[in-house]
Amino acid sequence: KIKTSFGGVGRNLVENLARLGHHVTFLTAIGNDPQGKQLKEELESLSVRVLTPSYLKNTSSYLAIYDEDSDMHVAVCDSEILDSMKVEDLLPFEDIIDSFQSIILDMNLNQEVIDWIFSRYQEHHSILIEAVSANKVSRIQNHLSHLSFYKSNLLEARYLLHEEKSAAELLSLLLEKGVKQAVISDSCNGIEYGDENGIHHFDVIPLKKIVSANGAGDALFAGILHALLEEKTLKEAVAFGDKAAKKALSSPEAVATDIADILKD
């Protein structure tokens, strides 16, 4: 069965946060094509402010093939428009970015843009990152000491740190390098999380049925961030993030449209 929907790590995070009641500004590269216009309109219908430089390229697209267990088997991504984003494209939005307390980055951004954001905003802003993939997480290598929050899966953390260690050991290394808070997910083996108060484990109870794994990691991050913004502890935030991830796993879409139901639990 072939299904088309909007996705992308950053976009998924934005939609999740908007559906959880947050006012979000999304600065990204969107093409001036029908897909880009529809994507922008859909987010704006959720009260998201969408800012984008003007591009003639096509909006990014992504094709994923899932196996019988609803796990991703292979994926192909066309992100040329993001890869071509330059620092000068962001300069018109410099003051808008400066007005926010927190900046969330996903590692789909190219190295030049990531380095500029840190050099420009690291002193007075909380910077939070989502690793995205093992081959892109190294883009954050030189900025770990300025990270307020880091989230990845186990494979991505191993690629970042060049260590075949356990999640707990990798968390310890991240904290030693100056990361303030970090979360490493390891599928049904659970979630490791840590901050200045130590490193802890969260047991994940597997769902009996998974509809799609697409977007589950993005929902986990969004749920954790929502709880932290509500001034919950990291332990409470991880538990809430797990609820958000389970919502995504139970949905055929990259973002569960009923994710706000977990606010009632």
Residue ranges and their predicted role:
Residues 27-29, 66:
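Short hydrophobic segments within beta-strands
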Residues 17, 153, 217:
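Short, conserved phosphate/pyrophosphate- and ester-handling motifs at nucleotide-, phospho-/glycolipid
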Residues 1-8, 34, 57-58, 138, ...:
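Residues at secondary-structure transition points
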Residues 27, 76, 202-203:
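Hydrophobic residues at beta-strand termini and immediately following loops
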Residues 167-265:
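Conserved phosphate-binding/catalytic region of the ribokinase-like
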Residues 42-53, 66-149, 154-199, 262:
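Ribokinase/PfkB-type carbohydrate-kinase core domain
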Residues 63:
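C-terminal catalytic lobe of FAD-dependent flavoproteins
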Residues 1-27, 34-45:
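Glycine-rich phosphate/adenosyl-contacting loop at the front of the ribokinase-like
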